[in-house]
UniProtKB/Swiss-Prot annotation:
The keyword Lyase applies. IGPS catalyzes the conversion of PRFAR and glutamine to IGP, AICAR and glutamate. The HisF subunit catalyzes the cyclization activity that produces IGP and AICAR from PRFAR using the ammonia provided by the HisH subunit. It catalyses: 5-[(5-phospho-1-deoxy-D-ribulos-1-ylimino)methylamino]-1-(5-phospho-beta-D-ribosyl)imidazole-4-carboxamide + L-glutamine = D-erythro-1-(imidazol-4-yl)glycerol 3-phosphate + 5-amino-1-(5-phospho-beta-D-ribosyl)imidazole-4-carboxamide + L-glutamate + H(+). The lineage of its organism: Archaea, Methanobacteriati, Methanobacteriota, Stenosarchaea group, Methanomicrobia. InterPro entries: Aldolase_TIM, His_biosynth, HisF, IGPS_HisA/HisF, RibuloseP-bd_barrel. Its EC number is 4.3.2.10. The active site is at residues 12, 131. This is Imidazole glycerol phosphate synthase subunit HisF. It comes from Methanospirillum hungatei JF-1 (strain ATCC 27890 / DSM 864 / NBRC 100397 / JF-1).
Length: 271
């Protein structure tokens, strides 16, 4: 797909504040998403994702304020996800200054939202986030994928932050999302998320090979080499990470230098 691979930090935001801790030195306010996003911008991020995990609809206005401030200060694409349930939500988010919206549970519950958003605002604005879990028992119509230990499994789409099974095959859903107008897939494996043991390569490569739109790998980064594996073996077009960047374990500039030396085409980091 894309010629250059992208590195994308993700910020979880609740009531307008970043909820995962950071240890960046020199930040006036480690809880301010715009300040953090600007720091990532300086480090050479290709995009930034804001994931709004605000529980109540009443506080949704706070993310709009954050988006507006970020759009004024950032010079890189901004994707916003979380709580986007209707076409009106999509419109408000884009009007506030987001370049793309990420829809997850709402897309599974109402697949027409993908088509409606793509038709209204363009496929380039629509990212369908897919959370998956491994299932080892074969079922009719499910795509079994070989695993490194010689076993195999199929991957089920899960919603509501990974808590709700759907019975939907991940590869079939990715294809449907593309057919309905998704411009990108943001794939997170619940098997690897938070483990720092690397991306879930089997499903990342399977979906990357099954669709013609970019796939963003998410969940499990712990080392520089995990980014490399996601691109080379997972065939992902972009890699998303959170904690390794937030806690200062590595910088985006360092990741890009490493990948460049390994022959991966990336957008050069410029101060």
């Amino acid at each position: 797909m894309t010629l250059t691979r992208r590195i994308i930090p993700c910020l979880d935001i609740k009531d307008g504040r970043v909820v995962k801790g950071t240890n960046f030195l020199g930040l006036r306010d480690a809880g301010d998403p715009v300040e953090l996003a600007c720091r990532y911008n300086e480090q050479g991020a290709d995009e930034v994702v804001f994931l709004d995990i605000t529980a109540s609809r009443e506080n949704r206005g706070m993310i709009i304020d954050v988006i507006q401030r970020a759009a004024d200060e950032l010079f890189l694409p901004l994707t916003v996800g979380g709580g986007i349930r209707t076409l009106d939500d999509v419109q408000k988010t884009l009007r506030a200054g987001a370049d793309k919206v990420s829809i997850n549970t709402s897309a599974v519950q109402n697949p027409a939202l993908i088509s409606e958003a793509a038709q209204a605002f363009g496929t380039q604005c629509v990212v369908v986030a897919i959370d998956v879990k491994r299932r080892t028992s074969p079922e009719p119509g499910k795509t079994m994928i070989p695993l490194p230990d010689q076993s195999s499994c199929w991957y089920e789409v899960v919603t509501h932050g990974g808590s709700q099974p759907t019975g939907i095959d991940a590869i079939a859903w990715a294809k449907e999302a593309e057919n309905r107008g998704a411009g990108e897939i943001l794939l997170t494996s619940m098997e690897t998320d938070g483990t720092k043991e690397g991306f879930d390569i089997p499903i990342t490569s399977a979906i990357s090979e099954s669709v013609g739109i970019p796939v963003i790998a998410s969940g499990g980064v712990g080392t520089f080499d995990h980014f490399y594996e996601g691109f080379v073996y997972g065939k992902a077009d972009a890699a998303l990470a959170a904690s390794v960047f937030h806690y200062g374990e590595m910088t985006i500039a360092d990741v890009k230098d490493y990948l460049s030396k390994k022959g991966i085409a990336i957008r050069p980091h410029t101060q």
